[in-house]
Amino acid sequence: MQIEENGQGTLRNNLSGKLAYYSFFPTPLQSLRQLNLTEETYRTLSACSRKLGELEGMLYFVPNADMYLTMYVRKEALLSSQIEGTQCTFDDLLSPSQTQLHHKDVADVVNYVRAVDRGVELLKKMPLCTRLLRQVHAVLLDGVRGTEKNPGELRSSQNWIGPSGCTIATASFVPPNIEDLSNTLQDLERFINEPQVEMDPIVRAALVHYQFETAHPFLDGNGRLGRLLITLMLINDGVLHSCLFYPSFQFKKNRSEYYRQLTSVRERGTYEEWIEFFCNSLLESAKDSVGSLKNLVGLHNRSTATITENLGRTAANGQRLLGILEEHPIVDTAFIAAQLDIGRSTASSLVKSFEELGILRPLDESRQRYRQYGYEEYLSILREDAEPIR
């Protein structure tokens, strides 16, 4: 790694002889040079704040808001994991047949969901600090691939980033050594928890995400935890009050540029370009979150009306089933019977009615027994741009 000195940090010489290598020690965020953001960046910041405010405001008027929150957390978990190469789909995540035992990628994403929930809960009890992040990391890697990488424990050895099979000498980036890591995390914690009255909270989130990714404080899971940290920062700074937002949406669509921008800050100190990219990414993600929420609410209203107008005496059970489908959009007859506490034959009749109304669709036409059904229009909204990167 070579750097053009622009206040972003220094290269540190470690060991000697054939074992010698350079690690990067980033400048503490409190000591950054004056940022010179463009007028366009300020306009994007303002637009992003307004769009996130619109999203927050919708929560007060949307029925069953908690259910939509759950789906959005799942989507963020999926998108962030896909950036790292996870091949799980949204249907995999929701399908009753794709258990964590049979699909390791599903287990990774489910753990991310649990980690988000844990982080938000911990924020109510303690400051956003290294101790909190360690607890969230322990959940993220609990019982899945990476378990051998000391979940919840800061690394005690040097790590590096580069192509598969590269050595520390040929790595494209070597994060701070152990001594510098401790100092970097202490500085980061102070920056997060000391008021920055003159700095927009979205800019703060951009800088904190960059600094965490550069510190790479764990042996595994740094990318996912770093993106989760964006949401925690926005909640911590009062921009958001919930996780009704999936910031990884645009990072995944522009994954190469996302990594290039992070690298550019380390090598050339291009903080302003990174902040502009970050703000644009969050703005586009917020726009998509608002649009999909409006579509989901519109679908709910149409489906409710369709059931009321067409199911007669079974409309009450139909409305109950709709509520179940909005939480579990992939189901089978046995699951419906158990959830509604009705007989299998009654559940089958209800499924048939929903098929005729176009609400449910069989996911596998070739199967007669144990057939699964999907709330297809609902799923299509959530699936948008959530396919794995091939």
Protein language model regions, located:
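FIC/Doc superfamily catalytic core
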Residues: 1-390
